[in-house]
Amino acid sequence: MAVKIRLKRMGAKKRPFYRIVVADARAPRDGRFIEEIGYYNPVSEPKEIKIDGEKAEKWLGNGAQPTDTVKYLFKKNGIIK
């Protein structure tokens, strides 16, 4: 099973926020996921990012592939270098 760490869109029209989730690569963007590891709110000022570093490192160690956006958020939070 190919596992991705990606963003799940939530919120209202024109006011999105995102949950950072671990999901099967074949599942729909907003569909079934395995575990939630954080959230990202780009609308608030300043932008809110909260990631559970232990869970993220566990999934990265198990071979989960982060998407480009999630990789950027991980770098910003110091989870990956």
From Swiss-Prot:
This is Small ribosomal subunit protein bS16. Pfam families: Ribosomal_S16 (PF00886). One of its GO terms (cellular component) is small ribosomal subunit. Belongs to the bacterial ribosomal protein bS16 family. InterPro entries: Ribosomal_bS16, Ribosomal_bS16_CS, Ribosomal_bS16_dom_sf. Keywords: Ribonucleoprotein, Ribosomal protein. It comes from Alkaliphilus metalliredigens (strain QYMF). PROSITE patterns: RIBOSOMAL_S16 (PS00732). SUPFAM superfamilies: Ribosomal protein S16. One of its GO terms (biological process) is translation. GO terms for molecular function: structural constituent of ribosome. The keyword Ribosomal protein applies. NCBIfam families: S16.
